[in-house]
Every structure is written in C-alpha cells, then in structure tokens.
C-alpha cells in the first residue's frame, strides 16, 4: 500500500512465546489481502467448529460451525495458529519487501516531534527520524506513556494458565479438530488444535486474588494446575497431565483511551486497546488496526495528522466493543449458576442459543478491512 516502514524491536531476536491464538475470518481476510493467507494456512489448523461444554459433566452445546462453513459464510477461513508460525510468516513477508527493514535489539526510550518530523531515541544512544511514529509496543507501551502519561495496570482478579500439548499424549477420542470452551463457576478452560492437529493449545482461567505476575514466562507445575481445576471433567484433567511445562500469568487491564493520536504519532494494538483474551480478538484487532492504518496513510488526502485522525476514528468504536465483549465473557464463562447442574444446563442453553451467539460474533466476523470507510 505504498508505505516505507522501519520496524524497531527491543528483543535481540524475533522469538514468540510457544502458545496458540485464534484468527477469525475478519483477521484472515486482512492476511489474505496482504498475500500471506495461504502461507499461514499451510502451517495452521482449520478447526471444524467450536463447542461449549460444562466443566464437570461435559454436556455440550454448539458455539458455531467453522471449516468450510466459515469460508462459505464469510469468505475466509477461521484458523487456529501457533504464535511463532504467525510471527515467522509476517517476518518473511516484511523481509521480502525490505530485507533490512527490521531492527532488532532496538528499544525506544522516548521521542520528540515537530511540525516536520518525529525523532525516536533508542537505548544505544542513537536516534532515528521519520514522518510518523506508530507505537505498536504492547501493553507496556512507551509511546502511550509519553503521549498520555502513566496509567497503572489493574489486576482483573483472574490468573491464566497456558500450555502446549503434543496431540499424541492425549487419548485418541480427544484428538478432535474442534475448539472447546469448558465453562464453570469461577473459571473456564479453552483448547483448540494447532499445526494441522499435531498440537493442542490449552488455556485455563481462574478467579484468584493471590497472583499478580504479568509475565507470560512464569513457570508453574502440573500439580498446581491440576489443583486449580480439581473436580473438573476427566478430559480437562487428561490435558493438564499431558502438558510438559505449564505457565501462568495474571491478567491485567488498563483504562481505555479516548484517543490514540497526537500530531505525527499514533498507537496500534495492545498499546491502545489491550483486552482480556476471552473473545479471541486481541491479535485480530491489531491486524485490523495495521491494515486500516496503512489504508489511511495511503488513501486519505491532507496532512498526516488528518490521516491519523481518520484511522483512529475508523477503529475506536470497534475496538471498544471488542474490549467490552472480552470482559463480558468473564461473567458469562464463570457464572455462579454453573455450580448447580440443573441451573447450569438451562443457563448454557440460554446463553449460547443461536441468536445470542450471532449477536456476539457476527459483527466481528463480517468486518472487512479492505472496504471499511475511513
């Protein structure tokens, strides 16, 4: 789309955590438009559907059909992806266009801007300048702090466990190409296949008050994890036993921003709309942001500040709804009614009735980054 971009990454190497993510049709639509959809699909898994299951009985409700149904309904697949594979595909795409366009070991410390340029100061004492600065620097965004001041992250009261399970470690009947949300009082478990069914991604979320480490790399033990989900269905226990090394982290929230941009600087992704991972839209929203921003920079006439304002206007309400929808799912997945067998059945049947599911997901999946008005 005609933008000459330099990427400054503080990590010394491009290495993603070993975890999965879900890319619904609104995300894969952008990746196909960028020409990397098929490359990623070849490394991923196209689940046939998603299910809701009760935490202790395993009783099941359909969440929605995927696979060919997603392609037929939305024009693009719903992929479950190993995060390092997505990073590799995107990195190769950038380097095909600009071999030296990614600068590793380059941590941004501060920036200044004037009417003509913006200058980024790096931790090695050097600085670089350009027409615009895009802060895609995550939940601890330096760019956000400089633009809008410090804001303290708040603990949501939820910890999450993650792990990657080799599919061969699971009983054969569990090696299914579906995604499952196990819902229970005060917690839930999500799992889905990765890498053409060779791996299973596991995430378990639990309401707790005694763990506030935000790092993704805090190791736990399978014994701790099993204790946290004691009494849950045997299939959940089987997955926990099969995880080689589980990790845990605290889910933190930051106040939403009423605006993202100032003159030549703007934000993207978690830097401006971090969300709890209960709508499977965090990565997708960042992909959408990037595509819409590129369109704004190349399609909108006028000064740069106007281009960034139009990008922000196109994205603010949608990302706000995604943040709120993710938070709403905490109560939906963890509802106290799920503790009682009879109430749980009625509750799940009502909450995941077809019209309710459609109201929560159709507006997400049908969004088209190539056509949205900017």
Pin down the residues of each PLM region.
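Active-site substrate-recognition segment that forms the wall
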Residues: 177-212, 218, 222-231, 251
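Conserved N-terminal helical subregion
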Residues: 24-166, 209-226, 364-374
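A structural signal for isolated positions on well-ordered beta-strands in alpha/beta enzyme cores
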Residues: 6, 101, 201-203
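Acidic/histidine metal-binding catalytic segments
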Residues: 42-45, 230-245, 304-309, 322
């Amino acid at each position: 789309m005609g933008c000459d971009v330099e990427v400054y990454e503080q990590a010394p190497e491009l290495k993603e955590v070993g975890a999965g993510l879900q890319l619904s049709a609104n995300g894969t639509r952008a990746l196909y438009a960028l020409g990397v959809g098929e490359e990623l699909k070849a490394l991923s898994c196209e689940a046939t559907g998603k299910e809701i299951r009760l935490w202790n009985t395993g009783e099941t409700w359909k969440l929605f059909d995927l696979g060919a149904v997603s392609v037929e309904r939305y024009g693009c697949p719903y992929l479950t992806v190993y995060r390092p594979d997505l990073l590799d595909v995107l990195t190769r795409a950038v380097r095909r266009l600009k071999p030296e366009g990614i600068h590793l070991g380059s941590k941004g410390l501060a920036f200044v801007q004037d009417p003509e340029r913006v200058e980024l100061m790096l931790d090695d004492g050097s600085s670089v300048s350009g027409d615009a600065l895009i802060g895609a620097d995550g939940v601890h965004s330096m760019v956000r702090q400089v633009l809008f001041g410090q804001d303290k992250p708040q603990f949501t009261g939820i910890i999450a466990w993650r792990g990657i399970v080799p599919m061969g470690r699971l009983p054969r009947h569990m090696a299914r190409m579906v995604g499952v949300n196990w819902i229970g009082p005060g917690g839930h478990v999500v799992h889905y296949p990765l890498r053409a069914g060779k791996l299973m991604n596991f995430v378990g979320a639990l309401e707790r008050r005694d763990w506030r480490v935000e790092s993704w790399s805090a190791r736990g033990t399978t014994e701790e994890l099993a204790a946290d989900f004691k009494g849950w269905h045997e299939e959940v226990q089987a997955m926990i036993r099969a995880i080689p090394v589980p990790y845990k982290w605290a889910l933190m929230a930051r106040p939403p921003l009423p605006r993202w941009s100032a003159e030549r600087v703007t934000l993207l992704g978690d830097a401006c709309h971090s969300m709890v991972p209960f709508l499977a839209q965090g990565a997708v929203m960042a992909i959408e942001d990037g595509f819409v921003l590129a369109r704004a920079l190349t399609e909108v006439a006028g000064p740069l500040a106007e281009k960034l304002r139009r990008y922000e206007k196109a994205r603010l309400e949608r990302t706000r709804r995604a943040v709120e929808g993710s938070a709403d799912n905490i109560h939906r997945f963890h509802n106290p009614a799920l503790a009682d067998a009879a109430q749980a059945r009625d509750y799940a049947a009502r909450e995941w009735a077809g019209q309710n599911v459609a109201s929560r997901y159709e507006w997400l999946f049908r969004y088209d980054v190539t056509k949205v008005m900017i």
